[in-house]
Structure formats: C-alpha cells, structure tokens
C-alpha cells in the first residue's frame, strides 16, 4: 500500500467520476408550482405580462399559470422533450425571442454545479425583466451569483418544501432530498 491507496485502486479509471448525467428531467409538484406563482405575484403584477417558461416539460408551470388566471396566449414555453400541448419543442438556449419584457418563471434543469441553470438564467436575461427560478440552495453562494448577469439583482429568496420534484420514471418518491429556494431576480 502506497499513500493509503491500495494497488487495486491506483488505476485511473477507479477514480473516474461515476455520476450519471442525463436530461435533468425532474418535474415540479403542482402544489410547489402554486407556491412559486403566488410568491412571484407578491413582487410582480402578472395580470398583463407575457410569461416565459423555458423548461416546460410536463407543463406543470403552464397549468399553474392557467390556474392563476394567465391567458394561454401570454404563455410561451419550450422543452427539448415536451410532454404538454402548450409546450413547444425546442432548445431554449438556442432560441432567439423578439421581446425584452418577459417574466421568466421556471424550474430550470440544474446540471452539474448548476451549470445548465446558470446558462438558462443568462440566456433568459436577454429577454426578461424578471427571472424567477426554483433552484438549489447553493444559488445563495457568491460563486453562483457572480456567474449570473450582473444587470440583475436578487429581490426575493424563499425556502421551499423538501419534496418539490418528481421524476416521470419513478413511481416512488426519491429518498434523497434537495433543499431548494425560489428566487426572484430583477
């Protein structure tokens, strides 16, 4: 044994990152969607706004917007694999929009170290006056905040319930819990 590492574990492959990555498809529970929309309404008059949902998935947020009185023509939603009639197929990160006055409300795909969520935020910042994201608590760190468009500032940060998400392939809830916050940026 050398350096506290046995012979069998010295191979490069044994230290490889074995975390699986995929399409980051974790969908938001409808009760959590309602909490997010209510929180957004405390800071933003959504009654006449155009809403951008760039990670539409199963349409949980789209359904929430409709429940909260937002007319369907004012909702724009994308996903690479849409599972709702009002969610258009498309990669938001490759999308160019005409308006700069959207309100973005979403549960973005996080990615490793929030890499995808940061990309979603920075792309949305080109088109939105407000960005409202359901994200891991790590977004409270300066290292995350400093990687976001500096023209935006945090106006609200709310702790969310422990079990915010479900996956379409799992019939039982996941045992590991992700601590999340709902942040509103302007």
Language model features by range: what are they?
Residues 1-186:
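Class I S-adenosyl-L-methionine-dependent methyltransferase catalytic core
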């Amino acid at each position: 044994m050398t350096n506290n590492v046995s012979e069998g574990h010295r191979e490069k492959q044994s230290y490889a990152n074995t975390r699986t990555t995929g399409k980051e498809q974790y969908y938001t529970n409808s009760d959590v969607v309602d909490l997010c929309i209510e929180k957004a309404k405390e800071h933003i008059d959504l009654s006449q706004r155009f809403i951008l949902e760039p990670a539409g998935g199963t349409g949980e947020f789209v359904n929430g917007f409709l429940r909260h009185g937002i007319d369907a023509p004012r909702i724009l939603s994308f996903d690479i694999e849409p599972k709702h009639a009002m969610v258009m197929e498309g990669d938001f990160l490759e999308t160019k929009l005409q308006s700069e006055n959207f309100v973005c409300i979403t549960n973005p795909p996080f990615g490793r170290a929030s890499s995808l969520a940061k990309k979603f935020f920075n792309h949305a910042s080109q088109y939105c006056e407000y960005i409202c994201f359901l994200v891991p608590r790590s977004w409270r760190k300066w290292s995350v905040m400093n990687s976001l468009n500096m023209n935006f500032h945090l106006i609200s940060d709310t702790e969310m319930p422990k079990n915010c998400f479900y996956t379409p392939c799992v019939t039982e809830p996941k045992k590991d819990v992700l601590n999340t916050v709902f942040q509103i940026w302007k």
